[in-house]
Amino acid sequence: MQEFQKTLEEIFRDFHRHPETAKEEYRTTQKVREFLEKQGIQILDLPLPTGVLAQVGSGEGPVIALRADMDALPVQEQTDLPYVSETPGKMHACGHDFHTTALLGAAALLKEREAELKGTVRLIFQPGEEINYGALAMLGTGLLDDVQEYYGLHTDPNIEAGTLGIRENAIMASPDWFGVTIEGKGGHGAQPHNCIDPVPAMASMILALQQVVSRRISPFSACVLSVTRASAGNTWNVIPGTAEIEGTIRTMSDEERDLGEQLIRQTAESVAAAYGCTAKVGYKRQSRPLINTPALAAFTTGLAEEMGIPVIRQEPSMIGEDFAEYLKDHPGCFVRVGTGIGPALHHPKFTVDPSVLSGTAEFLARTAQKRLEALRNA
């Protein structure tokens, strides 16, 4: 196991030194392919420019999938790691280098145990998670149509290294975007009576949107609405003709998501009209809420405890994760992996503790083995 851990740490450090952002994971894709080919693992013909899809098993019986994302972020690294990013302005600040390495480790373990597998394990090395592209792109190939269950993981800087965070039902939110353009009538700053000023409309709209969560959505529902940008005009003595705001709304269910969009549109249009303006509302749905299957959350918790891995009941997060797309029509479970207490995800000083790589790989491999056995015996 020590040699296995050493190998994984070398792979991890290489990925960390060479981060690639969404849709640009060409080197990462090649390195993943090289490792899998060396292990004798079958690589499927994936019709995407980046990403890898492979499989281990008999090709018969049940099929489950293990998924890792590969993309980095446009962040300038500020750690003092000996394997700091060598690409200016790019960094693995969300642990996807860890995810990819752990799945490669699981792939190697599953290949060693291939004769014991009661079905097939599909290995998803996914591009473009950070832009909500990769999961839908992978699903759109049709190469996952026979998968019965999906499993994935994510590093967590709020959990001690070696501990897993698992929770049933809603665990991550839908990270939707909204934007509003308020159209009035511009003119001289000394003559507001000859204008239709969009600036006070914008100010009132920001305040009104803050009431959506506190007054229109049940306090028993998890929902966050943040206006994150506001702009109007470009000089001091001119009333602008337009003003803009944009922000995000996060919800934990499809019903709350629908309601949130409806209320944003209704509020923006009503406030604009009250000031004599009009509002053009844009709304973009990103990944859906991530809902873990209760029975499989219980299964993975039990398996971890059997393996001697500490488990905590994970707190829900209002961050989004496109692994949710795999679970839209299929059961599965998304697990948080404690990689040491430290700076937050997406922070330029974010780090993970690579010493838990081999244990994480073993957990993924055992999950696949045990779930295939359970499905075969069902």
Where are the model-predicted features located?
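Histidine/acidic-residue-rich, glycine-tolerant segments that coordinate divalent metal ions
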Residues: 52-53, 73-75, 80-91, 98, ...
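General structural feature for long, well-ordered alpha-helical segments within catalytic domains
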Residues: 4-11, 24-35, 62, 90, ...
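Divalent metal-coordination and catalytic microenvironments
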Residues: 15, 54, 66, 96, ...
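Acidic/His- and Gly-rich active-site-bordering loop/insert found
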Residues: 1-92, 97, 101, 108-117
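Metal-dependent amide/peptide-bond hydrolase catalytic core
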Residues: 203-378
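Active-site beta-loop-alpha junctions enriched in small/polar residues
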Residues: 20, 69-71, 128, 156, ...
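Non-cysteine beta-strand/loop elements that form the S-adenosyl-L-methionine
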Residues: 65-67, 178, 334-339
